[in-house]
A protein has these predicted regions:
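Non-catalytic, polymerase-adjacent accessory regions of viral genome-replication enzymes
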Residues: 1-81
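Amphipathic alpha-helical interaction elements
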Residues: 46-49, 63, 67, 138, ...
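Short alpha-helical scaffolding segments that buttress acidic/His motifs in well-ordered protein cores
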Residues: 57-61, 132, 209-214
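Conserved polymerase palm-domain catalytic core
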Residues: 86-89, 93-108, 112, 136, ...
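Conserved phosphate-binding loops in nucleotide/dinucleotide-binding enzymes
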Residues: 118-119, 123
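Duplex nucleic acid-engaging cores and interfaces of nucleic-acid transaction enzymes
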Residues: 124-132, 166
Length: 250
Protein backbone atom coordinates (compact mmCIF):
# COMPACT_ATOMS: atom_id res chain seq x y z
CA UNK A 1 0.00 0.00 0.00
CA UNK A 2 1.49 3.31 -1.07
CA UNK A 3 1.33 6.31 1.21
CA UNK A 4 1.10 8.58 -1.80
CA UNK A 5 -1.74 6.73 -3.50
CA UNK A 6 -5.41 7.48 -2.97
CA UNK A 7 -7.25 10.63 -1.93
CA UNK A 8 -9.37 10.78 1.19
CA UNK A 9 -12.95 11.81 0.49
CA UNK A 10 -13.42 15.49 1.16
CA UNK A 11 -9.71 16.29 1.03
CA UNK A 12 -8.75 19.08 -1.41
CA UNK A 13 -6.74 18.12 -4.46
CA UNK A 14 -3.87 20.33 -3.32
CA UNK A 15 -3.15 21.64 0.16
CA UNK A 16 -2.01 25.23 -0.11
CA UNK A 17 -0.22 26.02 3.14
CA UNK A 18 2.66 24.15 4.84
CA UNK A 19 0.32 23.42 7.74
CA UNK A 20 -2.30 21.87 5.46
CA UNK A 21 0.30 19.81 3.61
CA UNK A 22 1.81 18.52 6.85
CA UNK A 23 -1.62 17.63 8.22
CA UNK A 24 -2.40 15.75 5.02
CA UNK A 25 0.85 13.79 5.32
CA UNK A 26 0.17 13.06 8.99
CA UNK A 27 -3.32 11.81 8.19
CA UNK A 28 -1.95 9.39 5.60
CA UNK A 29 0.66 8.05 8.00
CA UNK A 30 -1.86 7.68 10.83
CA UNK A 31 -4.33 5.81 8.62
CA UNK A 32 -1.63 3.42 7.38
CA UNK A 33 -0.43 2.77 10.94
CA UNK A 34 -3.99 2.27 12.20
CA UNK A 35 -4.76 -0.26 9.49
CA UNK A 36 -1.80 -2.44 10.41
CA UNK A 37 -0.42 -2.74 13.94
CA UNK A 38 2.62 -4.63 12.63
CA UNK A 39 3.59 -2.40 9.73
CA UNK A 40 7.09 -0.92 9.88
CA UNK A 41 7.63 2.34 8.02
CA UNK A 42 10.77 2.71 5.93
CA UNK A 43 10.38 5.77 3.67
CA UNK A 44 10.26 8.57 6.25
CA UNK A 45 13.59 10.41 6.26
CA UNK A 46 13.02 12.27 2.99
CA UNK A 47 9.76 13.60 4.37
CA UNK A 48 11.52 15.15 7.35
CA UNK A 49 13.41 17.64 5.17
CA UNK A 50 10.51 18.47 2.89
CA UNK A 51 10.17 22.25 2.61
CA UNK A 52 6.62 22.31 3.98
CA UNK A 53 7.56 20.11 6.94
CA UNK A 54 10.54 22.30 7.81
CA UNK A 55 8.50 25.50 7.53
CA UNK A 56 5.80 24.09 9.79
CA UNK A 57 8.46 22.87 12.23
CA UNK A 58 9.96 26.37 12.32
CA UNK A 59 6.53 27.91 12.93
CA UNK A 60 5.95 25.65 15.92
CA UNK A 61 9.42 26.16 17.37
CA UNK A 62 9.06 29.92 17.00
CA UNK A 63 5.65 29.79 18.67
CA UNK A 64 7.04 27.80 21.59
CA UNK A 65 9.88 30.28 22.08
CA UNK A 66 12.63 29.31 24.48
CA UNK A 67 16.24 30.15 25.12
CA UNK A 68 19.19 29.63 22.80
CA UNK A 69 21.25 26.47 23.00
CA UNK A 70 25.01 26.02 23.19
CA UNK A 71 25.56 27.98 19.96
CA UNK A 72 23.84 31.08 21.47
CA UNK A 73 21.75 31.49 18.29
CA UNK A 74 18.33 32.90 19.15
CA UNK A 75 15.05 32.78 17.27
CA UNK A 76 15.22 36.54 16.82
CA UNK A 77 18.73 36.36 15.34
CA UNK A 78 17.58 33.74 12.85
CA UNK A 79 14.67 35.93 11.79
CA UNK A 80 17.00 38.88 11.31
CA UNK A 81 19.46 36.90 9.18
CA UNK A 82 16.73 35.15 7.18
CA UNK A 83 14.52 32.18 8.02
CA UNK A 84 14.45 30.94 4.44
CA UNK A 85 18.24 30.63 4.32
CA UNK A 86 18.28 29.02 7.78
CA UNK A 87 15.82 26.33 6.68
CA UNK A 88 17.55 25.84 3.33
CA UNK A 89 20.80 25.13 5.18
CA UNK A 90 19.06 22.57 7.39
CA UNK A 91 17.47 20.95 4.36
CA UNK A 92 20.79 20.69 2.54
CA UNK A 93 22.55 19.16 5.54
CA UNK A 94 19.78 16.61 6.11
CA UNK A 95 19.60 15.70 2.43
CA UNK A 96 23.35 15.12 2.31
CA UNK A 97 23.28 13.04 5.50
CA UNK A 98 25.67 15.44 7.25
CA UNK A 99 23.43 16.54 10.10
CA UNK A 100 24.96 16.24 13.57
CA UNK A 101 23.16 17.61 16.65
CA UNK A 102 24.92 19.83 19.17
CA UNK A 103 25.06 18.96 22.88
CA UNK A 104 22.14 20.27 24.89
CA UNK A 105 22.69 23.13 27.31
CA UNK A 106 22.04 22.13 30.92
CA UNK A 107 19.80 24.38 32.98
CA UNK A 108 17.99 23.77 36.26
CA UNK A 109 14.51 24.84 37.32
CA UNK A 110 13.13 24.65 40.88
CA UNK A 111 10.63 21.93 41.80
CA UNK A 112 7.78 22.22 44.30
CA UNK A 113 9.70 20.12 46.84
CA UNK A 114 12.66 22.49 46.79
CA UNK A 115 14.82 20.28 44.58
CA UNK A 116 15.92 21.19 41.07
CA UNK A 117 14.85 19.62 37.81
CA UNK A 118 17.53 19.39 35.10
CA UNK A 119 16.56 20.59 31.63
CA UNK A 120 18.45 20.12 28.40
CA UNK A 121 18.05 23.00 25.95
CA UNK A 122 18.80 22.03 22.32
CA UNK A 123 19.88 24.66 19.83
CA UNK A 124 17.11 26.26 17.78
CA UNK A 125 18.47 24.40 14.76
CA UNK A 126 18.18 21.07 16.54
CA UNK A 127 14.71 21.94 17.82
CA UNK A 128 13.55 22.56 14.25
CA UNK A 129 14.95 19.23 13.05
CA UNK A 130 13.43 17.43 16.03
CA UNK A 131 10.08 19.09 15.41
CA UNK A 132 10.21 18.08 11.74
CA UNK A 133 10.99 14.49 12.71
CA UNK A 134 8.27 14.51 15.34
CA UNK A 135 5.75 15.77 12.78
CA UNK A 136 6.50 12.76 10.58
CA UNK A 137 6.80 9.93 13.10
CA UNK A 138 4.31 11.01 15.76
CA UNK A 139 1.19 10.01 13.74
CA UNK A 140 2.56 6.47 13.46
CA UNK A 141 2.87 6.07 17.21
CA UNK A 142 -0.35 7.98 17.86
CA UNK A 143 -2.19 5.17 16.10
CA UNK A 144 -0.98 2.80 18.84
CA UNK A 145 -1.45 4.93 21.96
CA UNK A 146 -4.20 4.19 24.45
CA UNK A 147 -7.39 6.25 24.34
CA UNK A 148 -7.02 6.91 28.08
CA UNK A 149 -3.59 8.53 27.61
CA UNK A 150 -3.69 12.34 27.62
CA UNK A 151 -0.19 13.66 28.30
CA UNK A 152 1.72 15.49 25.54
CA UNK A 153 -0.68 14.33 22.83
CA UNK A 154 -2.16 16.27 19.90
CA UNK A 155 -5.80 17.25 20.44
CA UNK A 156 -5.61 15.99 24.04
CA UNK A 157 -5.68 18.20 27.12
CA UNK A 158 -5.74 18.21 30.91
CA UNK A 159 -9.37 19.35 30.71
CA UNK A 160 -10.26 16.21 28.75
CA UNK A 161 -8.42 14.08 31.30
CA UNK A 162 -10.40 15.66 34.14
CA UNK A 163 -13.64 15.04 32.26
CA UNK A 164 -12.67 11.37 31.82
CA UNK A 165 -12.00 11.14 35.56
CA UNK A 166 -15.39 12.71 36.31
CA UNK A 167 -17.14 10.23 34.03
CA UNK A 168 -15.25 7.33 35.64
CA UNK A 169 -16.41 8.56 39.05
CA UNK A 170 -20.00 8.62 37.84
CA UNK A 171 -19.60 4.96 36.83
CA UNK A 172 -18.58 4.01 40.36
CA UNK A 173 -14.78 4.16 40.11
CA UNK A 174 -13.61 5.87 43.30
CA UNK A 175 -9.85 5.37 43.45
CA UNK A 176 -7.22 7.80 42.19
CA UNK A 177 -3.53 6.85 42.15
CA UNK A 178 -0.99 9.67 42.25
CA UNK A 179 2.41 8.32 41.24
CA UNK A 180 5.75 9.76 40.22
CA UNK A 181 8.58 7.81 38.63
CA UNK A 182 11.75 9.09 40.25
CA UNK A 183 14.44 10.12 37.79
CA UNK A 184 12.42 8.80 34.88
CA UNK A 185 13.98 10.78 32.05
CA UNK A 186 17.52 10.30 33.34
CA UNK A 187 17.22 6.52 33.61
CA UNK A 188 15.43 5.47 30.44
CA UNK A 189 17.31 2.56 28.90
CA UNK A 190 18.16 3.71 25.42
CA UNK A 191 18.37 0.27 23.85
CA UNK A 192 14.92 -0.56 25.18
CA UNK A 193 13.63 2.70 23.72
CA UNK A 194 15.25 2.06 20.35
CA UNK A 195 13.76 -1.44 20.25
CA UNK A 196 10.31 0.05 20.75
CA UNK A 197 10.91 2.60 18.00
CA UNK A 198 12.15 -0.12 15.64
CA UNK A 199 8.86 -1.98 16.07
CA UNK A 200 7.28 0.72 13.93
CA UNK A 201 10.17 2.35 12.06
CA UNK A 202 12.68 0.55 9.87
CA UNK A 203 14.13 3.64 8.16
CA UNK A 204 17.75 3.51 9.32
CA UNK A 205 18.32 7.20 8.77
CA UNK A 206 15.45 8.09 11.10
CA UNK A 207 16.70 5.62 13.70
CA UNK A 208 20.13 7.23 13.42
CA UNK A 209 18.63 10.68 14.02
CA UNK A 210 16.91 9.54 17.20
CA UNK A 211 20.05 7.85 18.50
CA UNK A 212 22.11 10.95 17.76
CA UNK A 213 19.76 13.07 19.86
CA UNK A 214 19.94 10.58 22.71
CA UNK A 215 23.74 10.56 22.59
CA UNK A 216 24.39 14.24 21.85
CA UNK A 217 25.74 14.89 25.34
CA UNK A 218 25.26 17.75 27.78
CA UNK A 219 27.16 21.01 28.16
CA UNK A 220 27.35 22.28 31.73
CA UNK A 221 29.72 24.92 33.10
CA UNK A 222 31.43 25.09 29.71
CA UNK A 223 32.20 21.37 29.56
CA UNK A 224 30.60 18.70 27.41
CA UNK A 225 30.00 15.32 28.99
CA UNK A 226 28.54 12.16 27.57
CA UNK A 227 25.40 10.61 29.02
CA UNK A 228 25.08 6.84 29.06
CA UNK A 229 21.37 6.59 29.79
CA UNK A 230 18.22 8.65 29.67
CA UNK A 231 16.85 11.31 27.38
CA UNK A 232 17.17 15.03 28.12
CA UNK A 233 14.12 16.88 29.40
CA UNK A 234 13.50 19.87 27.18
CA UNK A 235 13.95 18.24 23.80
CA UNK A 236 11.08 18.37 21.30
CA UNK A 237 11.32 14.63 20.67
CA UNK A 238 11.45 13.64 24.37
CA UNK A 239 7.69 13.53 25.12
CA UNK A 240 7.12 11.26 22.12
CA UNK A 241 9.75 8.76 23.30
CA UNK A 242 8.22 8.85 26.78
CA UNK A 243 4.76 8.07 25.38
CA UNK A 244 6.15 5.18 23.32
CA UNK A 245 7.53 3.55 26.47
CA UNK A 246 4.36 4.01 28.50
CA UNK A 247 2.21 2.72 25.65
CA UNK A 248 4.29 -0.45 25.41
CA UNK A 249 3.71 -1.14 29.10
CA UNK A 250 0.00 -0.42 29.03
Amino acid sequence: MSLEGGKRKGMPETAKTPNEKVRQLQRKLWVCAKRSKTRRFHALYDRIYRSDVLWEAWRRVRSNGGAAGVDAETIRAIEQSGVERFLADIQAVLRAGRYRPSPVKRRYIPKADGKQRPLGIPTVRDRVVQMAAKSVIEPIFEADFQVCSYGFRPKKSATQALEAIREAGNRGHNFVIDADIQGYFDNIQRETLMELVRERISDRRVLKLIRQWLEAGVMEDGRVRETLAGTPQGGVITPLTQKAIFSSNA
